[in-house]
UniProtKB/Swiss-Prot annotation:
Example of a GO biological process term: DNA repair
Top EC category: hydrolase
UniProt-recorded name of the protein: 8-oxo-dGTP diphosphatase
The organism's taxonomic lineage, starting at the top: Bacteria, Bacillati, Bacillota, Bacilli, Lactobacillales
The protein's required cofactors: Mg(2+)
Annotated motif Nudix box, positions: 38-59
Annotated organism of origin: Streptococcus mutans serotype c (strain ATCC 700610 / UA159)
Length: 159
């Protein structure tokens, strides 16, 4: 079965907004520091999903964002191949949701030089580097087995 989702990196110029997934029961991401995002709803475009998920999880309103790439995660959850649209947001407004109102985890602005020190999925360290380095548009595939990265490849598309 196919699952479509967005991954959204929010950048304030010196930090990325990450979520420490520490609130949701039976969460595949439990304990990890990840970007915000989520599953596309019926009839929703990736752009609409990204904007909705960012608002729901952070209360920030996206003014402009860049479509950075697509990542495939075959069989990431049992029986589900995940296809994720990756966005980077630099232009936003609003006030960050309070910790008590956040349902999935604790949000934190993480300085660029500390992003790679946070515990997360092995492949996410690669994505963090691409986002921080403003890499060209990419198509990637990360294969996990029992939460371990066992294969990966990426193609960057130069402008």
């Amino acid at each position: 079965m196919t699952k479509l989702a967005t991954i959204c990196y929010i950048d304030n110029g010196c930090e990325l907004l990450l979520m420490h997934r520490n609130k949701k029961p039976n969460d595949v991401h439990e304990g990890k520091w990840i970007s915000v995002g989520g599953k596309l709803e019926k009839g929703e475009s990736p752009d609409e999903c990204a904007r909705r998920e960012i608002f729901e999880e952070t209360h920030l309103i996206v003014k402009q964002m860049d479509f950075k790439g697509i990542i495939t995660f075959p069989d990431f959850t049992p029986g589900h191949d995940w296809y994720t649209y990756v966005f980077k947001v630099r232009d936003f407004e609003g006030r960050l949701i309070s910790d008590k109102d956040s349902r999935e985890g604790t949000l934190e602005w993480v300085p660029y030089n500390q992003v790679l020190t946070k515990p997360t999925w092995e492949g996410d360290y690669e994505i963090f580097k691409w986002i921080l380095d403003d890499a060209p548009f990419f198509s990637a595939k990360f294969v996990y087995q029992e939460q371990k990265l066992v294969d990966k490849h990426v193609i960057f598309y130069e402008k």
